[in-house]
């Protein structure tokens, strides 16, 4: 903290028995640093606009094109002017303590696109975009003459979270597991089990659809989907008997329903649990495959289509369940071998196979149309509209962003080593989430604790104002597009003619004046002031509401210890 000359000279007496060990930290640093980062000031007070939150917002919206691509409005930089009134004058006269925000814009107009393609460029013009409230050195804002504090918000960190319903959904008390991908901005994607062990998906908490519809929409067919989640075993047929080339490692922990033999030596007797000793014995005997009774195949799934070479008809189809009749059909045909999926009731549940059974779609196009119907009920679906909608949901950087924190959390949770990546969801990301969810259901992984502070993050002033500013700027973008399309191109257009700053000013005014998190400062005493600035709230836009917050949220979690005051826990 910087002390004035008189404060340095002031004699401070201490009547304590022990001397000070540590200097008092700057207790309101969190607020000041956050807002300075948004405006482009670093910790040393050096101003660098090109590395600020404001600059990022401008770059995410600009350049703006008109509908015919004849006009282009580019952003080249911004600067903040000097404040018109001092803090004291603002308090007395009831003004807001702010500085003018000026943006450098370059307008390019393509006059004659047909023949010469001639470009006419207006030089960079400075456009006034309204007043930007600035923070006093005490971490407060002066809005209409009153001091206000923007309280930091504690919300769920972007990333992927795995949870279960604690047995409340179904009367049997069965745990139904679910996964939720939460982006920084964009649509939420949920995967969940129902009581029949079928995996469903939801987008933005709408009605549920089979999770394989999402995989089909990404371009996978039935065979590829099964290959992603299951291993295959080859079954050979010799003299009317079935032999399987399965490693005993895969069956470890299960009880042998029949004698597992190699040549004539019994490796695992019937009714015994398969242990490491049996696995070692099989390895020393160099057992590659063993005979299985016909009943062992009942309920198993076929891995890929098997076609009769002579007639060309499909004997076995992909994901078909083997029944007693099908075993007899296989023995009657001239099949030498076929492949089955490795599933069991212990740790390799056939959840994706069951989901494919209830999936009404067969290819990518029908899957996209099914998703379109779920998102836009009542509208007639077309192939292009459905494809565009799905692309915009998770793979468009304009509509979807995990953020750097979200990507790091996501990668760590699904077991990747790299912590950086795209802000959008790739095919592999969605598959990794499903695989992790199935691993949790199979007992190889555990669910997350939602109230753990590691799964939450603090949104400070700078970030909140940045989001509000982005909303205002997107409204400006729409107005600019309309204006560009209706104006005559021959007119001498200037950037200031087509940019209207009112939407930005209005959103900022609304946030600082009426937002739940922008509060009138508690000025009863200096301590009340400091605790108000350091307070953390779970309420506010994008957070909880008082009515919906349950007991778990209000509880003191072990991770609060030494981090958050238990008396002022988020809204008690």
Model-derived segments and spans:
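N-terminal non-catalytic structural scaffold regions of very large proteins
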Residues: 1-533, 570
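Flexible, glycine/threonine-enriched loop-and-boundary segments that flank and lead into catalytic domains
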Residues: 123, 535-566
């Amino acid at each position: 903290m910087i002390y004035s000359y008189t404060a340095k000279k002031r004699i401070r007496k201490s009547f304590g028995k022990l001397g000070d060990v540590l200097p008092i930290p700057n207790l309101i640093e969190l607020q000041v640093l956050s807002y300075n980062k948004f405006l482009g000031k670093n910790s040393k007070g050096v101003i660098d606009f090109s590395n600020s939150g404001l600059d990022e917002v401008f770059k995410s919206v600009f350049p703006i094109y008109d509908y015919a691509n004849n006009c282009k409005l580019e952003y080249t930089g911004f600067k903040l002017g000097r404040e018109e009134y001092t803090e004291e004058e603002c308090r007395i006269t009831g003004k807001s303590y702010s500085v003018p925000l000026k943006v450098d814009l370059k307008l390019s107009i393509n006059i004659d696109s047909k023949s010469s393609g001639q470009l006419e460029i207006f030089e960079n013009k400075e456009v006034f975009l309204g007043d930007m409230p600035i923070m006093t050195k005490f971490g407060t804002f002066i809005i209409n003459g009153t001091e206000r504090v923007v309280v930091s918000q504690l919300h769920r960190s972007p990333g992927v979270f795995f949870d279960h319903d604690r047995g409340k959904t179904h009367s049997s008390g069965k745990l139904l597991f679910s996964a939720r991908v939460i982006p920084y901005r964009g649509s939420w994607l949920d995967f969940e089990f129902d009581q029949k062990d079928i995996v469903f998906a939801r987008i933005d908490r709408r009605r549920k659809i089979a999770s394989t519809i999402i995989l089909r929409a990404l371009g996978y067919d039935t065979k590829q989907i099964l290959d992603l989640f299951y291993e295959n075993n080859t079954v050979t047929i010799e003299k009317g008997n079935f032999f399987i080339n399965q490693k005993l490692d895969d069956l470890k922990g299960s009880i042998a329903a029949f004698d597992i033999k190699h040549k004539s030596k019994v490796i695992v007797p019937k009714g015994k649990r398969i242990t490491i000793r049996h696995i070692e014995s099989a390895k020393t005997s160099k057992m590659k495959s063993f005979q299985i009774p016909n009943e062992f195949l009942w309920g198993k799934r076929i891995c890929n289509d098997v076609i009769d070479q002579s007639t060309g008809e499909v004997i076995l189809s992909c994901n078909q369940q083997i029944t007693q009749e099908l075993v007899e059909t296989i023995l009657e045909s001239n099949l030498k071998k076929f492949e089955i999926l490795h599933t069991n009731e212990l740790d390799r549940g056939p959840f994706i196979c069951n989901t494919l059974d209830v999936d009404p779609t067969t290819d990518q196009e029908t899957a996209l149309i099914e998703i379109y119907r779920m998102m836009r009920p009542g509208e007639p679906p077309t192939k292009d509209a459905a494809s565009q909608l799905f692309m915009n949901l998770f793979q468009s950087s304009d509509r979807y962003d995990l953020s750097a924190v979200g990507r790091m959390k996501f990668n760590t949770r699904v077991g990747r080593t790299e912590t950086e990546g795209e802000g959008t969801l790739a095919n592999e990301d969605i598959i990794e989430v499903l695989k992790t969810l199935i691993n949790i259901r199979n007992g190889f992984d555990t669910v997350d604790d939602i109230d753990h502070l590691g799964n939450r993050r603090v949104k400070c002033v700078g970030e909140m104002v940045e989001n509000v500013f982005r909303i205002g700027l997107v409204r400006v973008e729409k107005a600019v597009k309309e204006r560009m399309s209706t104006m005559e191109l021959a007119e001498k257009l200037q950037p200031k003619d087509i940019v209207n700053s009112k939407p930005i000013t209005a959103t900022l005014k609304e946030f600082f004046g009426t937002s739940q998190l922008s509060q009138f400062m508690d000025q009863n005493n200096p301590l009340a002031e400091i605790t108000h600035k350091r307070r953390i709230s779970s309420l506010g836009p994008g957070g909880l509401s008082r009515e919906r917050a349950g007991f778990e949220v209000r509880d003191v979690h072990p991770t609060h210890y030494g981090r958050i005051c238990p008396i002022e826990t988020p809204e008690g």
